[in-house]
Amino acid sequence: MAVSELEVDGVVFPPLARPPGSAHAHFLAGAGVRGMEIGGHFIKFTAIGVYLQADAAVSALAAKWAGKPAADLASDAAFFRDVVTGEFEKFTRVTMILPLTGAQYSDKVTENCVAYWKAAGVYTDAEAAAVDKFKEAFGPHSFAPGASILFTHSPAGVLTVAFSKDSSVPESGGVAIENARLCEAVLESIIGEHGVSPAAKLSLANRVAELLKGAAHAGGEPAAEPVPVSV
């Protein structure tokens, strides 16, 4: 199956991307909005695209999930956990729909992470230091609509944080944070069991199910086909 681009609330996610500092191309696995019901209205804050390493993700996920319908993947927390923890790179692009400060974003993300780690009894000095470095990376930034936050999640447990004033992806740069729990937690907060973007989760389940089906038949990796489709 060819991989198409997705448009989410006017934000276009191309079918392929190469994260800052990565040697690997990534395909668009899914995309959707993050929003919240406020006063009876659904307010959209960000559009989120999740990319997976093209030369490793499909084969890694196929062993357990190939042949299963999208509905099964979408309803199974273990599938999303396998995406988060899989031995392949992931790349997440968060593009603003409404303006947001770096402090607002980083405080909310780390607040949820720390609460989870403390409840699980795994919050150590290493996690505290990683959280501080994460907040420092965001401190001087404010994000206008259209600006993007870029996360590269390494299977070695390194989270690279970069920024763009638009939807472009810089070839290099960013802040590298070596902490496996934080690296996983950022993606887990988006597509995990209590992920903030159900739309991105559903999109990812639908597209990966088709890719696994196509890979099983063709024995190959996804190719790019830049044709807009709905989420």
Swiss-Prot record:
It catalyses: a chalcone = a flavanone. The keyword Transferase does not apply. GO terms for molecular function: chalcone isomerase activity. InterPro entries: CFI, Chalcone_isomerase, Chalcone_isomerase_3-sand, Chalcone_isomerase_bundle_sf, Chalcone_isomerase_sf. Pathway: Secondary metabolite biosynthesis; flavonoid biosynthesis. Keywords: Flavonoid biosynthesis, Isomerase. Catalyzes the intramolecular cyclization of bicyclic chalcones into tricyclic (S)-flavanones. Responsible for the isomerization of 4,2',4',6'-tetrahydroxychalcone (also termed chalcone) into naringenin. This is Chalcone--flavanone isomerase. It comes from Hordeum vulgare. The gene is CHI.
